[in-house]
Structure formats: C-alpha cells, structure tokens
Amino acid sequence: MIQVQSRMKVADNTGAKELMCIKVLGGSWRKYANIGDVVVASVKNATPGGVVKKGDVVKCVIVRSKKGVRRPDGSYIRFDENAAVIIKDDKNPRGTRIFGPVARELREKNFMKIVSLAPEVL
C-alpha cells in the first residue's frame, strides 16, 4: 500500500535508486496504490550517469509491495520491500532491465514489457 510520501526502491536500470510517491493516479480522492498501479514520484537518490537524475519527477508502476495482494484463489502475495519501475507514458519501461521478481497482477494490467523483462514472475 503506497501513499503520498512513501519511499520505494527502483527495480530497473534507469539510474534511480529510491523514489518518493508524490501522487497516486486514478482519481482525485484516491489515497493508496498497490501492485500494478501507476504513481507519480520524485527521484530521491540516483547513481551518477543514469537516465534519470535526483529531483526528476517520473511516472512509475508498483511491482512489489509489502502489503499483501489477494489473488482470486484466496491466496496472498507479499514482498519484503516496496519497489517500482519507472515507465514512459505508453506503459513501457524507461530502463532495459528489471531486477528482482514481479507480481503476476502486472500481466492483467497490461504491463507486458515489464513482465517479459523480469527474471521471475510470482
């Protein structure tokens, strides 16, 4: 469950290391985002020479969340950290690699490129 001011790790190779959520997209009163939701975030920590710099405002999709997501069969999937992938406006990732596992819910929300680049889909 990501809300405004939540900090997340970055699960791609754009050069950003840490993001802070600025806005949850999808409605004016929406407070929380979960796996597969798009948020606007600020880059808080970045490596030198990367695609994005510290202070950049980017769109990203949540790929891992500490808050469990309920599956249709009744099971829950949760991760040890909150992580996001920086995306372009056409839902494609800005980076060329994805690090760590991602949830299967991304496939249902049409983030196919992220799912195909991920080393593991849980």
Swiss-Prot record:
GO terms for molecular function: large ribosomal subunit rRNA binding; structural constituent of ribosome. It comes from Ruminiclostridium cellulolyticum (strain ATCC 35319 / DSM 5812 / JCM 6584 / H10). PANTHER family: 50S/60S RIBOSOMAL PROTEIN L14/L23, LARGE RIBOSOMAL SUBUNIT PROTEIN UL14M. Keywords: Ribonucleoprotein, Ribosomal protein, RNA-binding, rRNA-binding. This is Large ribosomal subunit protein uL14. Binds to 23S rRNA. Forms part of two intersubunit bridges in the 70S ribosome. InterPro entries: Ribosomal_uL14 (IPR000218), Ribosomal_uL14_bac-type (IPR005745), Ribosomal_uL14_sf (IPR036853). One of its GO terms (biological process) is translation. SUPFAM superfamilies: Ribosomal protein L14. The keyword Ribosomal protein applies. Pfam families: Ribosomal_L14. Part of the 50S ribosomal subunit. Forms a cluster with proteins L3 and L19. In the 70S ribosome, L14 and L19 interact and together make contacts with the 16S rRNA in bridges B5 and B8. Belongs to the universal ribosomal protein uL14 family. GO terms for cellular component: cytosolic large ribosomal subunit. NCBIfam families: rplN_bact.
